Swiss-Prot record:
Essential fertilization factor required for male fertility. Part of a conserved trimeric sperm complex with the essential fertilization factors IZUMO1 and SPACA6 which bridges sperm and oocyte membranes during fertilization by binding to IZUMO1R/JUNO on the oocyte. One of its GO terms (biological process) is sperm-egg recognition. Disruption phenotype: Mutants develop normally into adult males and females. male mutants are sterile, whereas females show normal fertility. Residues 26-223 are extracellular. It comes from the Eukaryota. This is Transmembrane protein 81. Disulfide bonds join 101-157. The keyword Disulfide bond applies. The keyword ATP-binding does not apply.
Length: 259
């Protein structure tokens, strides 16, 4: 046993001794040392978080010396997430309304490069795709002129690239249509008297129920008008007194002359 162990140790030492000689023979060929490759040296993120977007990349030739040469800039399409969630809308029966599936990136490329498909889950707000049925529309818009209660539901818009039918966007629209007599969505009519005064520019203290007072500029105008009225009344009284005294003095002197 001891003899076998000694032999194993001696062979290991001999292998270690010849290892540098083996490594010396593994030289990199001169052709590979001069090789040049194209590498992406800079890249931006996608311009949108969902749907079709764009990213920018800079690609350069890099050699063994690490110097960048012949760099090119390119703008590429990208899709981080093609499902874009839901938008909610509440309208009143009889109103005109439109759903729009377009985005700035689609408009930049041109809507003719895309295919638009709509599906509808009538009468319910949901993203469960099993509830949707085909809806006859192949444009990026759905218009309601006017909208009726049976138009309520969830509309799903799918956008595909025509060149390869790749899905690049899915957007849900939750549409609620209320009866005209159920609720009044008129902002002005829903305000209290104090809120209407505030909306017109009055200053109202809603905490203690104090009477509303005019804004600063209106208070200045009111004060100026008040001062003018008071000054006019006082001036009129003084003029009346002066005239009365003048008339009284003339009558007295005439009487004394007659005497």
């Amino acid at each position: 046993m001891k003899t076998g162990a000694i032999v194993f140790i001696l062979r290991s030492l001999l292998s270690i001794t010849y290892l540098p000689l083996v490594l010396m023979t593994l030289d990199i060929p001169e052709e590979l040392q001069k090789a040049v490759g194209r590498v992406i040296v800079n890249a931006t993120g996608c311009s949108v978080t969902c749907g079709l977007g764009y990213k920018e990349e800079t690609e350069c030739e890099v050699g063994p010396d690490g110097v960048r040469r012949n760099c090119t800039f390119q703008r590429l399409e990208c899709v981080t997430n093609w499902i874009c969630g839901m938008l909610h809308f509440t309208i009143v029966h009889g109103k005109t309304f439109e759903l729009n599936c377009l985005s700035s990136d689609i408009l930049e490329k041109g809507q003719e490069a895309f295919r638009f498909t709509w599906r509808l889950a009538r009468g319910i707000i949901s993203t469960n795709d099993e509830l949707f049925r085909p809806f006859r529309a192949n444009s990026p818009f759905i218009g309601f002129k006017p909208a009726y209660e049976y138009n309520a539901g969830t509309y799903r818009c799918d956008v595909q690239l025509l060149k390869n039918l790749k899905f690049v966007k899915r957007l849900y629209f939750g549409l609620r249509v209320l009866p005209p007599k159920l609720v009044n969505l008129n902002f002005q009519q829903s305000l209290t008297e104090d809120q209407k005064l505030i909306d017109k520019g009055w200053e109202v203290n809603l905490d203690n129920g104090s009477k509303p007072h005019l804004p600063v500029w209106q208070r200045k105008v009111t004060s100026a008008l008040g001062i003018g009225i008071v000054a006019g009344v006082v001036g009129g009284v003084l003029v009346s007194v002066a005239v009365f005294k003048a008339l009284g003095g003339t009558d007295g002197s005439g009487g004394r002359t007659r005497l």
